[in-house]
């Protein structure tokens, strides 16, 4: 257990989170990480040995900023978050697959899912740290790589909104069937996080196999 993070995750109102995910495809949660934990994660950005790859976003026309992929082994806090958050998100992912007429295929625990990824040659860890300066941004995109991927992503804010930076809202664009797209601009407080769907989801009020998609920035 990393400074009680397991207990904090277990204490979340998961029934409310599942309801939000089903209704709108994302769920915003108040601070889960403490200020000192956020500071510790920010400080890691300058520790070269922790990362396997650095991406200059402007070089690839992804936006303006940069991010770094962690290499194995992951920092204990990040590993603990992955292991504790995955099971409930897997429940939601399987529920949505069934509503779309597909077989529930996500294991109940993280390790069997990672083993499934490894069997498909997907062995590199994907958690990352992003860094933006004034004027930085991330273009709309969907993060789905390889034959096996998990349909949810979780993002944490590590700085203080309106103190360390201004703006910086997280943009989700919902692509709805037979309707115009709808945007959601979400401000995340320090230590808070956002769960969001990055692939097809069933649409409330429509036939079970009707889908909507989300694009992120």
What does each model-identified segment do?
Residues 150, 161, 165-217:
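Catalytic core of Fe(II)/2-oxoglutarate
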Residues 1-23:
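Fe(II)/2-oxoglutarate
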Residues 138-145:
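Histidine-centered catalytic micro-motifs
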Residues 111-131:
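Alpha-helix-centered segments that form part of catalytic cores
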Residues 21, 121-124, 147-150, 165:
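A generic fold-level signal
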Residues 129-134, 147-164:
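Short, conserved beta-strand element in jelly-roll/cupin
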Residues 90, 128-130, 141, 155-157, ...:
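Residues in well-ordered beta-strands of folded domains
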Residues 16-113:
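Non-heme Fe(II)/2-oxoglutarate
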